[in-house]
């Protein structure tokens, strides 16, 4: 269960980061059962943009999707890296109108990001990370060529009104270079799991140094 305010915060945080305006066309590619479908479908009315509802058969066809993006003038596309890999496996399509590609749902391999930037240097590449339990995206990272030289792409910085912590099992902050678990606090953190209080109690815990009643995921 997530709050309406968390989902709205996710939508609003994308507007300044991606510099969205009434000139944009957002591709709605996700199933209605997935969290990312909410922002894909509902963010555009916030700033007067257009939503292009992509047919399911096209949304899962790498080359068909790119052709659709070009034909419909789509400016913002979110996709999983495995589909992006298929997009780059064949001849290039111009994508003159696309402004942003947001890989999400899987870890984006640095080499794949490198290949994308080589083919489409004019299209901004933003690594989007976030669990459904926290109202979709909680971090963005603008990928450039330098960042593709590492073993992993960074998760990035928190989205508006969310906070990220790297913590140990005792919920203590770990020092730089140490291994820890990524924990999320802020507006995006949901209520918990429906009819599963035990799982909720294990995953949504009191924030050890937050405001009274605040929780971490």
PLM features per residue range, with description:
Residues 1-3, 7-10, 20, 26, ...:
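A generic "structured core" feature
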Residues 2-27, 35-75, 145:
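Conserved AMP-binding/adenylation subdomain of ANL enzymes
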Residues 7, 118-127, 139-217:
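AMP-dependent adenylate-forming
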Residues 21-22, 28, 38, 94-97, ...:
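His-Asp-centered acyl/peptidyl-transfer active-site segments
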Residues 46-51, 74-78, 88-154, 160-163, ...:
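Gly/Ser/Thr-rich phosphate-binding loop
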Residues 82-84, 108, 189:
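Alpha-helix capping/helix-boundary segments
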